[in-house]
Amino acid sequence: MAAHFSGALQLTNLDDFITPSQECIKPVKIEKKPGAKGLAKIKIESDGSYVQLSEDGGKSKLQKAEITLNDCLACSGCITTAESVLITQQSQDELFKILDSNRKLVKEGKGDVQKLVVISISPQSRASIAAKFNLTINDAAKKLSAFFKQLGVHYVFDTTFARDFSLAESQREFVRRFRAYQQGDEGCTPMLASACPGWMCYAEKTHGDYILPYISSTKSPQQIMGSLVKDHLASVVGKSPDSVYHVCVMPCFDKKLEASRDDFYNDMYSTRDVDCVISTVEVETMIQDHCPDFNSIDPVELDKLYCSSDSGDFFGHSGGGSGGFLEHIFKYASRELFDEKVDVLTYKTLRNKDFREVTLQVDGKDVLKFAAAYGFRNIQNLVQKLKRGKSPYHFVEVMACPSGLKFLAQDLFGPTFYPTLEPRSLEKNVQQKNGVSCIFI
């Protein structure tokens, strides 16, 4: 798994990649042993473990250094590369620990105290799995449901409803902000889309209080799903939030950082809205290890937290990939604020393909100006314009990765699988073949 753990680390020719700080501000404490002196060598054993060889020929096994995601968030070093350190709380291993514990409790006759294990699958991950195994969207979802339930998972959900909710609230939030801007409150715009954890880390660590008021306050679909599972589902099945173990399957590794934030921690029950995030790549590894004949597995319908479709088929939205925020909010705001119906957005590429803008004109006057800024090079330019009061935009969709979710389209295939793929990503490409399109994570 380590070789696949960060898609970003596998890419080349990336000119705005931010490397970690030279010195970690949360270093591992080294215990000095009495009598230790002289030089020592470190050797890697055949099983991959590290041992220290002293001058007198002695050998001692070295303890592996560990760091939690909360430590990562407190560090001033890496931004999008935090997953390159050893993560102990957000991995498939943690899920298997819970499932193993549940099996032991059931054997001991204590099944009533086992954790209720819930998995929520994002449309992008579902689409990547469908493409990987040459399945339709619906078949991939049902086979994933069957696979996870064979492992011992109790509920498997789709996150479409949470995405609908997040999108609708983002639309309303922008209209509120724009109307306040029209009344003279210039601090309300531009509204910056905030579902990208890498961007959020950068904004908080680098620009702090200055930039935060511009960032949308709407929860991401992942965290909305977390609230629904830990509050609504838990109450429906008669469980407390801390007795529910919630896992989200996401295409973006930085969603692990988002789930680990203290903002989404319930102090009363000492639990997080999302206990664990596993990436699409990790799910593929799980399938290879536990269900090599994945295509032959008997399908099982996904569970329905809220019913999105009577037929059970998935539905989506136009504006797939990274463009979900911008396109839907632009169309909604055009209709709500100016009574203008916009069917197709015409983008204008500025300095590079990762910085595009779209404008609504009424009577020859620009009344709405939106932009999409992907990658830290463009983000830094945007922030500098904001600080100088030179930003002309009312809304900006921000993604830390260059090309937005094009990064995530390569999570199972590598950068050469779709070499000419546009930023709308593999997810939209695959889903539209099945009559479905998606928005954001």
Swiss-Prot record:
The keyword 4Fe-4S applies. [4Fe-4S] cluster 1 binds at C24, C72, C75, C78. GO terms for biological process: iron-sulfur cluster assembly. GO terms for cellular component: cytosolic [4Fe-4S] assembly targeting complex. Keywords: 4Fe-4S, Iron, Iron-sulfur, Metal-binding. One of its GO terms (molecular function) is 4 iron, 4 sulfur cluster binding. [4Fe-4S] cluster 2 binds at C196, C252, C401. Belongs to the NARF family. PANTHER family: NITRATE, FORMATE, IRON DEHYDROGENASE (PTHR11615). Component of the cytosolic iron-sulfur (Fe/S) protein assembly machinery. Required for maturation of extramitochondrial Fe/S proteins. This is Probable cytosolic Fe-S cluster assembly factor v1g210509. It comes from Nematostella vectensis.
